[in-house]
């Protein structure tokens, strides 16, 4: 099978690694990719305009792929999948209308309300609101204050704070950009990321994972795109996963069909598990980053066949997914000054830099035959083991041998679960 992957981050490196290991994959391409991906696929670095449907179609018509896998959310919201499907190309990823479940938080709230899915109460604050009206809404919702940019913000458009001034500042910042704000009630409880393959009303869950959004240890610092993740969750039972599928993912998939925007692709439910069970924090319309990296490292079922089943509408015929009986942890190595203004161009050295079992490249480039940093989240380090403790130890051992000036990483990815400090009633 000839396959084209769209994207250039650590998530796409993980997807390429999985596809390359599948005997059904005969020819693998990526755009725009990264020099680090060249050992797995043909890299089309000139095709950087991933959100331009015409440009992506041009590449697809040249390559003639049997399957296109779209990694990031921006091309999905921009309608790249629609354009490719219109030309008869099988695509893993939702059409633009369905991708609004991530592209507009207000739209996602409408879907959840219609589907009867538990979520935080919310109010949309449009640009142009008076200061008095904003203060009235802050009185009603906080503290804690949960302030979200209604559009795409790469996981960094959310402020959760007890500081009213900080909440007010973020509202004004989002409004100044011309975007609405979604003000929400705070959802307490441990967070769960559950990815589901969705083909119309057919829903197949992957292993549950937990992301770590804050930049620094102990969940301190600003929100980021994600500083690490682990899977599976020792504190969430199979019955708990079934409950999320039954109460959240299946009703949303059914509601999308009823709205005339059937979902095809990966539906990512970000949830908080409170006293009454799971409530939705957000939906994403694609594989999450960095949760995808540990998840796919445990998947035994060949990946190309899985993604193709979704893309061709045959997910209901796919045999049950098989997983390694193990734990996996991903820790993100971030550049200096991430997430505000990450520094680029610093040399990276490690004896494991080309070992995709240990390191995936999220934001690197090559200059004068030297690997350098080229993004905020630079490397994703993978550790696997029979226990969560062993997986954590494996990841941090690799990190100790990486040199990147002024870089940093969290030392507590998965630690609360390892120490038994997370528990729920499922």
From Swiss-Prot:
Record-annotated disulphide pairs: none
Pfam families reported in the protein's UniProt record: GARS_A, GARS_C, GARS_N
Annotated source species: Corynebacterium ammoniagenes (Brevibacterium ammoniagenes)
Associated pathway: Purine metabolism; IMP biosynthesis via de novo pathway; N(1)-(5-phospho-D-ribosyl)glycinamide from 5-phospho-alpha-D-ribose 1-diphosphate: step 2/2
PROSITE patterns: ATP_GRASP, GARS
Protein known as: Phosphoribosylamine--glycine ligase
HAMAP family in UniProt: GARS
Domain ATP-grasp span(s) in chain numbering: 109-312
CC cofactor note: Binds 1 Mg(2+) or Mn(2+) ion per subunit.
Cofactor entry: Mg(2+); Mn(2+)
Keywords from the named record: ATP-binding, Ligase, Magnesium, Manganese, Metal-binding, Nucleotide-binding, Purine biosynthesis
Domain of life: Bacteria
Gene Ontology MF term list: ATP binding; metal ion binding; phosphoribosylamine-glycine ligase activity
Binding site for ATP: 138-193
Family that this chain belongs to: Belongs to the GARS family.
GO BP terms: 'de novo' IMP biosynthetic process; purine nucleobase biosynthetic process
Matches recorded under PANTHER family: PHOSPHORIBOSYLAMINE--GLYCINE LIGASE, PHOSPHORIBOSYLAMINE--GLYCINE LIGASE, CHLOROPLASTIC
Entry's transmembrane regions: none
Catalytic activity, as annotated: 5-phospho-beta-D-ribosylamine + glycine + ATP = N(1)-(5-phospho-beta-D-ribosyl)glycinamide + ADP + phosphate + H(+)
EC numbers on record: 6.3.4.13
Binding site for Mg(2+): 282, 284
